[in-house]
Amino acid sequence: LKEPSSTATPVPAASGGVAAEQASAADIPSLEGKTVGIAAKDIVHDFSRVVYDTVQERVEELGGEVIATQAEAKENKHVSDVENLIAQKPDAIIVILGDTTTLGPALEKVNEAGIPLFTIDFQSEYSVNNVTSDNWVIGSTVARTIAEDIGGEGQILVFNGFTGVTPCRIRYSELEVVLEDYPKVKLIQPELQDKYEGTVEDAKQQVNDALRRFPEGEIDAVWSCWDIPQIGAAQAIDAAGRDEIKVYGVDAEPGALDMIADPESSFTATVAQQTTAMGTQSADNVALFLSGATEEVPTTSYLEPVFIDKDNVDEVRNELGI
């Protein structure tokens, strides 16, 4: 992938965002006597599990108490988890991932209860701060890489089942923007709809069906906003011997990295997010805010992504320990 340099990572001026820098616990105000509620959508996948564990560890390291819930990827449970946290009157609530439409009313209740809301990879009008990767950079860089890798001409099979999830919405939007400058690159319609449970097998079946509909030369790449469906996609493509098709994802899931490291696999590239840093940064922002240092807490804390392809996968895995 065409990795941007650290000085080239843009932060939208209107967002109030900053590129987040990690601080030691000694530099962050104590959370002693404070209780922080944590509501995660799930801990099914590596990304959400690491963030969930890390934010709890950091709150406790800063002296705070944690009330942690995870919704097992069930939207209704995620809503009820947030509502149950409100009833326990914590000093702050951190929500990890979620669907904007489904969670909106519950987050409005958090706001009405006067409880500061913090989010991770989930934008909300009620959030004091959202910690996230720079999804505009992720989306545009992956899109440009695909377009260049297929020679500026061809057809892309797309998984687009999570339009209500902020990172996916942004990454897909950037794909559309980039392709405006590649008029010979088309998105295959109708787009595929990825699922959150049974993702790999479902995606594998959908791509198998697509391979039957579109013979060799009619699919050049497969795009998704995350890695899990792409593992199934790559399995289907590799089993069919369709080595003309390249697969691209986001999240640097271990299974995806293993496939990228395999020169025979169609899985071509992914993007690592700084999951440990995201959890730590969110807890630090809570501590700063509750201490009264509100001016030190931006609307959005952006963490720089790391782009991984077949050329650098081993090096990046060693450097990041993934």
What name fits each language-model region?
Residues 1-322:
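A residue-level marker of the well-folded mature domains of exported/periplasmic proteins
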